[in-house]
Amino acid sequence: MTIAVIIPVLNEARCIGQTLSHTTTLGFDDLIIVDGGSSDETGAIVELFADRLLAPHSAPTQPPPCIRFLTAPPGRARQLNAGAASSRCDVLLFLHADTHLPMNARQAIATALSDKACVGGRFNVRLDSDRPLARLIGNMMNLRSRWSGIATGDQAIFVRREVFEQIGRFTEMPLMEDIEFTRRLKRAGRLAFLQDQVVTAFRRWEQNGPLRTILLMWTLRFLYWIGVSPYRLQHFYRMVR
């Protein structure tokens, strides 16, 4: 079983280097970074990292993944689809640029997908802060996901390639592409809700205040569930940020 990790980026210079350093040690086959038009040093950091990894003096403990840096029109769904189209791996794992996978991520995915009825899944999430509120947010995200059967991008969604193609890839919409995708994915078969944790940055909540961010996210998801267009939600999101 071959597994590709696909990371969409847009101005992620502050964190992409650390994420690449960690992810390349985990034994994946492809590592595909898809840039949606960064204006910072994201591209330069990725290219320098790839050059260093493949340098003759480099001595990794295991063969490094095939690293590719692509560009695509801005929009997370477009970037994810572009990355998926560039890989022929059996399994696609979609990872945020500020998120680190557990050390056993590859084995956990392989074990989950050894069940032929399982079409994909996600990991539990933990925020990289010791604040009690951060722990509460992570726990609530995991409970909400298990209760609803829906995964979000923070949780590192993975899927069999053939199922990804069969259900129509990510719908190219400005928001909620992860929720819309996993709605379709869970109709295709069983999802694995792995207890192993990815660690993601608390910065998104800190930038605009944790409580304000939680309220905004819950409001957006509620409006989406009752049928408000993602394009209208994008307009609302820009207004209140």
Question: What residue spans do the PLM features occupy?
Answer:
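Short aromatic/hydrophobic "clamp" motif used to bind/position activated sugar donors
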Residues: 92
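A conserved acidic beta->alpha catalytic loop
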Residues: 22, 35-44, 99-100
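Acidic donor-binding/catalytic loop of UDP-sugar-dependent glycosyltransferases
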Residues: 41, 97-111, 183
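Conserved donor NDP-sugar-binding/catalytic core segment of glycosyltransferases
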Residues: 103-133
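Acidic helix N-cap motif at the loop->helix transition within catalytic regions
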Residues: 14-18, 40-49
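Conserved donor nucleotide-binding strand/loop of the catalytic core
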Residues: 32, 43-86
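Short, well-formed alpha-helical segments that are part of the catalytic scaffolds
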Residues: 11-25
